[in-house]
Amino acid sequence: MITGVFSMRLWTPVGVLTSLAYCLHQRRVALAELQEADGQCPVDRSLLKLKMVQVVFRHGARSPLKPLPLEEQVEWNPQLLEVPPQTQFDYTVTNLAGGPKPYSPYDSQYHETTLKGGMFAGQLTKVGMQQMFALGERLRKNYVEDIPFLSPTFNPQEVFIRSTNIFRNLESTRCLLAGLFQCQKEGPIIIHTDEADSEVLYPNYQSCWSLRQRTRGRRQTASLQPGISEDLKKVKDRMGIDSSDKVDFFILLDNVAAEQAHNLPSCPMLKRFARMIEQRAVDTSLYILPKEDRESLQMAVGPFLHILESNLLKAMDSATAPDKIRKLYLYAAHDVTFIPLLMTLGIFDHKWPPFAVDLTMELYQHLESKEWFVQLYYHGKEQVPRGCPDGLCPLDMFLNAMSVYTLSPEKYHALCSQTQVMEVGNEE
């Protein structure tokens, strides 16, 4: 859980991508007319060839970002930081252009908070490392063993990796790769990161002025909403937290999730209200960034959707040079990325995204018709995206549904720099 910073980079000209999307749509319409006339059956999945996989994942279990103001504090022992031997895998971090790793203001902030026991706030633990290794093993089973899609050893020509410039995400990526490739590699592992003020792998409230302004009023009044307000007061009273302490459902959930993931002794009342705390954290998030507020959702994850979309279009474009396409794209993100991302795709289940959760996007081509399809999985379960007839979605239908929220870098910067913005929710 973080509050982010936004701006955007991309590699393919917008005009080219638009033309590709239009041609794809026209071809799809023509095929649909033929199929309707001939009364053809649904797509034969045995004739589908996997062409590309994109995986967005949340980091593994970590220490809380901010301790609760309680007399009895949970002890976070540095032994929890021991690195499991099977997760050891060397990597290098660069900026998006391949230059030196950018400075990480978030890691500096986390090191200002020392928890009882000696750990810093927001540190990936061995539990989190094992979770990420297990996710990597699942991906290996899916794309190396069950389907011989990826090489069994890491090949930099097949895999592109990008992470937010936060240490727990970089280390989570290391562990995932160790599980996926069993610590075997044919070349250097490069993890690409961006500057905090231009990051788009999370909603960048710090740099996107309009997003910050549109949601400011709702952030200030979220804890005062009917239902949320009463439940927050009840939890704080039962836990002995003073009403003046700035503790909301986000902070409560952050602590209860971290403690439960590590089986640490917790405040009994925190455990008792765990389910309600999660639900109210979700309610609060949806109040701040509601699905009806299209522009805010666009600014929150539109640039990231644009990256995912561009990868899809480049993969299906025969003119794209082979060295510009990877079989696997990995993106290390956060819970605050997942909620708006899942909302825009129409698959949010109203549960807080857990540690090490993944959203996997597969791109297929039909061997006979040459048509393209997308398949989505969240937390390992097949999903039906908004605007799609079923789990196996024609690419043009998927892109059309995404286009409601996708933002090119130019449009993103234009929206973020608007000077006249009504603060959503301030007039309620």
Curated annotation (Swiss-Prot):
Cellular compartment(s): Mitochondrion
GO molecular function: acid phosphatase activity; lysophosphatidic acid phosphatase activity
A Gene Ontology cellular-component term: mitochondrion
Substitution effect: D335A: Abolishes enzyme activity
Effect of L289W: Decreases activity toward substrates with medium and long aliphatic chains, but not toward substrates with short aliphatic chains
InterPro entries cross-referenced by the UniProt entry: Acid_Pase_AS, His_Pase_clade-2, His_PPase_superfam, Histidine_acid_phosphatase
Subunit structure: Monomer.
Family: Belongs to the histidine acid phosphatase family.
Protein name according to UniProt: Lysophosphatidic acid phosphatase type 6
